[in-house]
């Protein structure tokens, strides 16, 4: 499993990936230099990988091996020449032979790989060249019978989508691009930083093929100092496609089926299809030349949208608004069914943004959902956590410092090298508290919780109780938590309560670290 962390004291923006193979779990290191860090005349991306030659890895091709392949291939194709010379072909064949010896690949596997390596320069500035990078990734994943695309699902969205630094197009879907018109999209509008807007089109059907198309438009204000009337806005549009095919039996496959089932339940229609779901939002505009679904202004208030406070702190808000009053209840039922899926979609979008901030900024900030959702808040929170965290977990490697600091408060690591369950629980607690913080700050708590909230701790709302119960799982001294909250909470003072819970969690976490807390049961 690969994990991110920023280099301390490195203002250049370089990222270091700590990789651990899925077999021997030996550490790997991969350094990526972004395009803006190169000297004049250089181009592309530099990879530095250090696989252990002493480990017998025959028959296994995992993420670390993919890194090694990319390092060799991309360093060779890092030139402006768009033609394949004899030397390049010979170099590629040498790489293939080395792979055959190092990893014990069969001739059939090498034939698939060589067709990719020799087809075109990989690191050209064309979209096709960038697609070749991801084609290699998907091919390498399919070479090993024990490794499928679904096995690298988290790694793909978290890591591979950023291979090019400014990579804007990723496609590992086995379906041809011509089939895009057969898919029925769910339309979402994503608000990022001020001045930036994105429209994300999620294309899905009952065969669980998902395609996320982010269309980001940035308005740049050009000021003319000589003439105030000549100040103009320049619109720049960037399109990014993230697509995957969910394998039957995978966590996402089950999650997507759950989403479909919940949508059918909410709509009181067991035969409801994705087409009918999107049709209920009047999404019927034709596809344009780019294959994107344009949303008419008059229907935009009827579709779902995600609103982001910034590109780092994702403030997830889900709302639907119907123009006709008599359609409001129907839209609310549909909206409730879409909420878990939106959490999954938001994670996909946010995972492509979160690594660009400092470790202190890389705290997931997910709010809960607005409106009187028929699904309870506890269920919403559970679905949100399920969509954000996979079952694999992250182990702390003290020797190689591969711990992803972006998941911690400040820069404090976990209490001991074997206590990764503690960290998973801590991540869930942080998520729950940010949800709680957002509910209080923006007043978007479900009605039955909001009604109880104003009474303070004497009538603790269920959401606060859920956070408290989660905290107790990792708290050495339950009394510490209870006394801290009761001592500092002011009745009828929601803001004070919010700060108190966050502070209490931070104190408990730091105290557990200092006490070297045992692994929670």
UniProtKB/Swiss-Prot annotation:
Residue ranges, annotated region (Disordered): 1-20
Q: Where is the composition biased (Polar residues)?
A: 1-15
**What is the protein's given name?**
Uncharacterized protein VP6
What's the name of its gene? S6
């Amino acid at each position: 499993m690969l994990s991110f962390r920023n280099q301390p004291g490195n203002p250049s923006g370089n990222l270091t990936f700590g990789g651990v193979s899925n077999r021997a779990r030996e550490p790997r290191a991969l350094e990526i230099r972004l395009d803006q860090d190169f000297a004049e005349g250089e181009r592309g991306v530099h990879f530095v990988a250090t696989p252990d030659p002493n480990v017998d890895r025959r028959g296994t091709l995992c993420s670390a091996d993919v890194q090694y392949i990319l390092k060799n291939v991309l360093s060779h194709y890092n030139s402006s020449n768009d033609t394949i010379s004899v030397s390049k072909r010979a170099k590629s064949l040498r790489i293939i032979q080395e792979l055959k010896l190092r990893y014990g690949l069969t001739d059939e596997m090498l034939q698939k790989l060589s067709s990719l390596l020799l087809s075109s320069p990989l690191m050209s500035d064309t979209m096709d060249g960038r697609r070749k990078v991801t084609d290699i990734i998907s091919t390498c994943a399919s070479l090993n019978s024990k490794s499928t695309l679904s096995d690298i699902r988290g790694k793909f969205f978290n890591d591979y989508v950023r291979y090019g630094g400014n990579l804007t197009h990723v496609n590992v879907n086995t379906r041809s691009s011509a089939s895009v018109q057969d898919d029925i999209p769910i339309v979402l509008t994503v608000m990022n930083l001020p001045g930036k807007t994105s429209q994300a089109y999620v294309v899905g059907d009952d065969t669980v093929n998902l395609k996320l198309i982010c269309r980001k438009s940035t308005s740049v204000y050009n000021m003319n100092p000589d003439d105030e009337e000549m100040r103009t806005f320049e619109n720049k549009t960037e399109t990014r496609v993230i697509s995957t095919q969910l394998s039957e039996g995978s966590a996402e496959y089950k999650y997507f089926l759950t989403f479909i089932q919940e949508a059918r339940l909410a709509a009181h229609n067991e035969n409801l299809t994705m087409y009918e779901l999107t049709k209920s939002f009047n999404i019927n505009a034709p596809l344009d030349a780019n294959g994107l679904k344009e949303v008419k202004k008059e229907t935009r208030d009827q579709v779902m949208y995600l609103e982001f406070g910034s590109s780092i702190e994702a403030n997830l808000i889900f709302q639907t608004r119907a123009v006709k009053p008599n359609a409001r209840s129907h839209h609310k039922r549909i909206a409730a069914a879409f909420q878990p899926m939106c959490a999954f979609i938001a994670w996909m979008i946010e995972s492509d943004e979160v690594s660009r901030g400092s470790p202190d900024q890389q705290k997931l900030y997910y709010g809960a959902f607005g409106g009187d959702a028929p699904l309870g808040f506890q269920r919403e929170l559970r679905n949100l956590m399920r969509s954000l965290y996979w079952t694999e977990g992250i182990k702390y490697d003290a020797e190689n410092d591969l711990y992803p600091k972006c998941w911690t408060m400040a820069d404090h690591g976990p209490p001991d090298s074997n206590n990764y369950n503690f960290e998973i629980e801590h991540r869930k607690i942080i998520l729950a508290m940010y949800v709680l913080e957002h509910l209080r700050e923006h007043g978007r708590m479900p009605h039955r919780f909001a009604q109880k909230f104003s009474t303070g701790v004497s009538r603790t709302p269920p959401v606060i109780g859920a956070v408290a119960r989660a905290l107790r799982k990792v708290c050495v001294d339950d009394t510490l938590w209870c006394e801290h909250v009761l001592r500092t909470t002011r009745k009828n003072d929601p803001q004070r309560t919010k700060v108190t819970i966050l502070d209490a969690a931070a104190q408990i976490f730091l105290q557990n670290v200092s006490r070297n807390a045992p692994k929670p049961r």
